[in-house]
Amino acid sequence: MERPTVVSGGTTTISIASVANGLPGRYATALYELAADRWLLNEVLPQAEALRGLIDGNADFRALLSDRTLDIKDITRALLAVLDAQGFGATIRHFVGVIARNRRLSQLPAILDALRAIAAAKRGEEVAEVVSAQPLTDLQRVQLQSRLAEAGYSRVNIQERVDAALLGGLVVRVGARLYDTSLRSRLTRLHHAMKGAA
C-alpha cells in the first residue's frame, strides 16, 4: 500500500478498502458481527470506546501492547486482569484475549478505530478523528462541526485525541480524507524547503 504524502493545510485520499480489508478491519468486523448477532452492540461499542480511552490515556498500557519481549501468556493474564478490574464485559475481555493469543496486540488501537468507523457507517455517520495539541474548547468543537458541515459532512461523530507533539493546530481525518493544519507539519515542510534551498 502506498503511503500518502500530506501537505500542511491540504488533503489526501487514503484507500477505505485498505482499512476495511486490512487486519484491523477484519478483526473489527468480526467483533461487530459477533456483538450484533448476540444483541450486545449497546454493551460492546461503549466498552470498545472506553478501552481506546484507556490505551490513549496510559503510556504503560500502550507499552505493554507493543512489548514483544514478554511472554504472551503473562501479557494476556495481565491484560485480562486489568480489563476485569476496570469492569469490561466478557465479550471485550475474550476479544482482547484472542488478539493477544494471535500476537496482534500492537494492532489493538487500529482495530478499535476500525470498529468505531464500522459502527458509524452502520448508523449512516462519518467519524471525524480529531487530534489536537491541547483539548478542544466547546467553541472550537462548534466551529469544527460547522466547518465539517460546510465541507459536506452533515452527520459527523467527532472523536478527539490530544497529542502534544503536534505543537499546535489540528489533524482531522474524516473517512478517506486527512486535513493536517498542525504546526509540526508546517515546521517539517519548512525544514524540507530550507534543506532544498541549501
Curated annotation (Swiss-Prot):
F(1)F(0) ATP synthase produces ATP from ADP in the presence of a proton or sodium gradient. F-type ATPases consist of two structural domains, F(1) containing the extramembraneous catalytic core and F(0) containing the membrane proton channel, linked together by a central stalk and a peripheral stalk. During catalysis, ATP synthesis in the catalytic domain of F(1) is coupled via a rotary mechanism of the central stalk subunits to proton translocation. This protein is part of the stalk that links CF(0) to CF(1). It either transmits conformational changes from CF(0) to CF(1) or is implicated in proton conduction. This is ATP synthase subunit delta. InterPro entries: ATP_synth_OSCP/delta_N_sf, ATPase_OSCP/d_CS, ATPase_OSCP/dsu. Gene3D superfamilies: N-terminal domain of the delta subunit of the F1F0-ATP synthase. Keywords: ATP synthesis, Cell inner membrane, Cell membrane, CF(1), Hydrogen ion transport, Ion transport, Membrane, Transport. The gene is atpH. One of its GO terms (cellular component) is proton-transporting ATP synthase complex. F-type ATPases have 2 components, F(1) - the catalytic core - and F(0) - the membrane proton channel. F(1) has five subunits: alpha(3), beta(3), gamma(1), delta(1), epsilon(1). F(0) has three main subunits: a(1), b(2) and c(10-14). The alpha and beta chains form an alternating ring which encloses part of the gamma chain. F(1) is attached to F(0) by a central stalk formed by the gamma and epsilon chains, while a peripheral stalk is formed by the delta and b chains. It is a peripheral membrane protein. It comes from the Bacteria. One of its GO terms (molecular function) is proton-transporting ATP synthase activity, rotational mechanism. The keyword Cell membrane applies. It is found in: Cell inner membrane. Belongs to the ATPase delta chain family.
